[in-house]
C-alpha cells in the first residue's frame, strides 16, 4: 500500500521549467519622463531667475496746455524785465546799455571766430605787438576806438584823466611837455567851438560846429586798412 502511494506520488510530480522573468521593454520610461520633467523644471527656474529687461518709458510729449503755460511764463518774465528797466535811473540805464552792448560784442566776436574757424581766444588789442611807427599808429587807432565806445558814461572823463596820467608816468619830462602842449591846443580849440555853438542860434538846416579828431576817421581806418589821416601824428 505504501508502495502504491509512493508510486502515485512519483507519477503526479511534474517538474516544470521555471518561467523566465518577464522583461517589460517599456520599463524605465516613466523614470526617464520624470528626469526629463525635472530638467525642464530646472530650465524654467533658470529662465525665471534671469533679469528681465525693462523698457524705458516713453517721454511724454508736451501737450498744448503745458506749451501755453510756458508761453505765459515767458511773457510775464518779459513784462517784469521791461518794468525793471523802466524804473532805472538814467545812470543805471546807461550802465545797463553798456552791459548789454558788451554782451552783444562778445557774442558777435564768438560767432565771427566760429565762422572763420578761429580757435584762439587772443584777438583785438591782445593781438597787437607793435614795433614800427605804422604798427603803433594802428594800435593807437584801435585803442582809441575801443575807449571811445564808453564816452557817453558819466565816468568817462575821470577815466581818461587817470589813463593819461598813468601813461605819462612812463614818459620823460620832455615827452610829457609835448603831450601837455597838444592837450592845451586841443583845449583851446574846444573852447572856441563851444563858444561858437553857444552864440549861434539854432536854425533849420544849420549843423553844429564840431572839432574833427582822429576818432572821426577810426571807422574808415578799421574798414579800409591803414589809410589813416596824419591828424593822429599831429595831435600826439
Swiss-Prot record:
Pfam family, one: eIF3_subunit
Superkingdom per UniProt: Eukaryota
Biased composition (Basic and acidic residues): 47-58, 68-77
Stored InterPro entries: eIF3-like_dom_sf, eIF3j
Keywords: Coiled coil, Cytoplasm, Initiation factor, Protein biosynthesis
Ranges for region Disordered: 1-84
GO MF entries: translation initiation factor activity
Protein localization: Cytoplasm
Biased composition (Acidic residues): 28-46
GO (cellular component) term, any one: eukaryotic translation initiation factor 3 complex
BP term (GO), one: formation of cytoplasmic translation initiation complex
Keyword Transcription included in the entry's annotation: no
Biological role: Component of the eukaryotic translation initiation factor 3 (eIF-3) complex, which is involved in protein synthesis of a specialized repertoire of mRNAs and, together with other initiation factors, stimulates binding of mRNA and methionyl-tRNAi to the 40S ribosome. The eIF-3 complex specifically targets and initiates translation of a subset of mRNAs involved in cell proliferation.
Family as reported in the entry's similarity comment: Belongs to the eIF-3 subunit J family.
Description of how the protein assembles with itself and partners: Component of the eukaryotic translation initiation factor 3 (eIF-3) complex. The eIF-3 complex interacts with pix.
Name assigned to this protein: Eukaryotic translation initiation factor 3 subunit J
Amino acid at each position: 500500500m505504501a508502495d502504491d502511494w509512493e508510486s502515485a506520488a512519483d507519477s503526479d510530480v511534474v517538474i516544470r521549467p521555471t518561467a523566465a522573468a518577464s522583461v517589460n521593454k517599456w520599463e524605465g520610461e516613466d523614470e526617464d519622463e520624470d528626469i526629463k520633467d525635472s530638467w525642464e523644471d530646472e530650465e524654467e527656474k533658470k529662465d525665471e531667475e534671469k533679469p528681465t529687461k525693462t523698457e524705458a518709458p516713453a517721454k511724454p510729449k508736451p501737450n498744448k496746455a503745458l506749451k501755453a503755460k510756458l508761453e505765459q511764463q515767458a511773457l510775464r518774465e518779459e513784462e517784469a524785465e521791461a518794468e525793471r528797466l523802466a524804473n532805472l535811473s538814467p545812470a543805471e540805464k546807461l550802465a545797463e546799455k553798456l552791459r548789454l552792448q558788451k554782451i552783444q560784442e562778445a557774442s558777435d566776436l564768438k560767432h565771427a571766430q566760429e565762422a572763420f574757424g578761429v580757435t584762439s581766444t587772443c584777438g583785438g588789442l591782445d593781438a597787437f605787438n607793435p614795433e614800427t611807427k605804422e604798427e603803433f599808429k594802428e594800435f593807437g587807432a584801435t585803442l582809441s576806438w575801443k575807449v571811445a565806445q564808453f564816452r557817453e558814461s558819466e565816468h568817462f572823463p575821470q577815466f581818461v584823466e587817470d589813463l593819461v596820467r598813468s601813461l605819462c608816468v612812463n614818459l620823460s619830462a620832455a615827452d610829457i611837455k609835448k603831450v601837455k602842449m597838444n592837450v592845451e591846443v586841443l583845449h583851446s580849440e574846444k573852447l572856441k567851438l563851444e563858444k561858437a555853438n553857444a552864440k549861434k542860434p539854432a536854425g533849420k538846416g544849420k549843423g553844429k560846429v564840431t572839432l574833427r579828431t582822429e576818432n572821426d576817421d577810426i571807422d574808415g581806418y578799421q574798414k579800409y586798412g591803414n589809410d589813416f589821416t596824419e591828424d593822429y601824428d599831429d595831435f600826439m
